[in-house]
């Protein structure tokens, strides 16, 4: 069912599952780490404003921390098409707003779809301007989408464990939000305009990383906290198993792409 909210569309089925799955993954991360800290969240735009949330892509789990810190706002995000080959995982990320991108042969829909969603729905967009976890170069996709959708760019950085072992050993996680970037002053989004936006984003990433150093340390919480988190971890695992079973069945019934076509 599609509901209209402030003249923008919301897909209720996707919204409910998005909220549930975000909560489940956050519970799992809290159970195995429980040492996350969020800074400058007052800079996040209000819920009525759509924006592009951008960050350097450093781990598999930084998108979850980004989505949790900005709740109840919900997002769409780009994902390489290979992630959609698994029936259950592919259905999960589609229900949570992911849309496939062919990195070898990108199509016009890679730009058109997020622009339409930012304009027509109440969802914002998560992007990693570097494109992958193995690159630090800011590319121009976020600039083009922000300009055409007439939205601001919201930078955030993740500082924390880069491996699953570090996450489980409860190394500190810091999410630091920067100043929203307004690009309305850039009249033409040509090569020069794209480079200007990329430089603004990269400069803010560097500033945030430097600022985070004052909070980030190697101190780990008291290991006795595991006695509290073990029951939560067991609960999260049980819920995850039930969710996998439900998702497998639901993937034959509910097609997220069908409703998404109505939205876009």
UniProtKB/Swiss-Prot annotation:
Function (record text): Converts lysophosphatidic acid (LPA) into phosphatidic acid (PA) by incorporating an acyl moiety at the 2 position. This enzyme utilizes acyl-ACP as fatty acyl donor, but not acyl-CoA.
Broad enzyme group: transferase
Domain topic, free-text comment: The HXXXXD motif is essential for acyltransferase activity and may constitute the binding site for the phosphate moiety of the glycerol-3-phosphate.
Pathway(s) annotated for this protein in UniProt: Lipid metabolism; phospholipid metabolism
Reaction(s) the record says it catalyses: a fatty acyl-[ACP] + a 1-acyl-sn-glycero-3-phosphate = a 1,2-diacyl-sn-glycero-3-phosphate + holo-[ACP]; hexadecanoyl-[ACP] + 1-hexadecanoyl-sn-glycero-3-phosphate = 1,2-dihexadecanoyl-sn-glycero-3-phosphate + holo-[ACP]
Keyword Nucleus: no
Family: Belongs to the 1-acyl-sn-glycerol-3-phosphate acyltransferase family.
Keyword entries, A-Z: Acyltransferase, Lipid biosynthesis, Lipid metabolism, Membrane, Phospholipid biosynthesis, Phospholipid metabolism, Transferase, Transmembrane, Transmembrane helix
A biological-process GO annotation: phosphatidic acid biosynthetic process
Location in the cell: Membrane
Enzyme nomenclature, EC number: 2.3.1.n4
Bilayer-spanning residue ranges: 16-36, 233-253
Gene Ontology terms, MF aspect: 1-acylglycerol-3-phosphate O-acyltransferase activity
SUPFAM superfamilies in the cross-refs: Glycerol-3-phosphate (1)-acyltransferase
Gene Ontology cellular component terms for the protein in this record: membrane
Membrane topology, from the record: Multi-pass membrane protein
Name this polypeptide is given: 1-acyl-sn-glycerol-3-phosphate acyltransferase
Motif (HXXXXD motif) on chain: 57-62
Keyword Plastid: no
């Amino acid at each position: 069912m599609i509901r209209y909210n402030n003249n923008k569309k919301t897909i209720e089925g996707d919204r409910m599952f998005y909220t549930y799955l975000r909560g489940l993954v956050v519970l799992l991360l809290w159970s195995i780490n429980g040492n996350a800290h969020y800074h400058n969240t007052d800079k996040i735009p209000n819920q009525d404003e759509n924006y592009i949330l951008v960050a350097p892509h450093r781990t598999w789990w930084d998108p979850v921390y980004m989505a949790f810190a900005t709740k109840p706002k919900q997002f769409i995000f780009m994902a390489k098409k290979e992630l959609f080959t698994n029936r259950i995982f592919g259905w999960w990320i589609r229900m949570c707003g992911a849309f496939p991108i062919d990195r070898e042969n990108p199509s016009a829909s890679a730009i058109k779809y997020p622009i339409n969603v930012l304009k027509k729905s109440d969802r914002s967009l998560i992007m990693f301007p570097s494109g992958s976890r193995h690159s630090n170069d800011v590319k121009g996709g976020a600039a083009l989408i922000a300009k055409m959708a007439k939205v601001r760019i919201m930078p955030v950085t993740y500082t924390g464990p880069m491996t699953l072992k570090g996450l489980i050993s409860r190394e500190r996680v810091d999410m630091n939000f920067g100043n929203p970037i307004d690009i309305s002053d850039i009249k033409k989004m040509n090569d020069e305009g794209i480079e200007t936006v990329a430089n603004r984003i990269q400069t803010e990433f560097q500033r945030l990383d430097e600022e985070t150093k004052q909070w980030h340390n190697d101190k780990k919480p008291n290991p006795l906290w595991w006695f509290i988190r073990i029951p939560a971890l067991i609960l999260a695992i049980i819920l995850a198993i039930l969710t996998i079973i439900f998702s497998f069945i639901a993937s034959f019934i509910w097609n997220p792409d069908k409703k998404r076509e109505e939205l876009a």
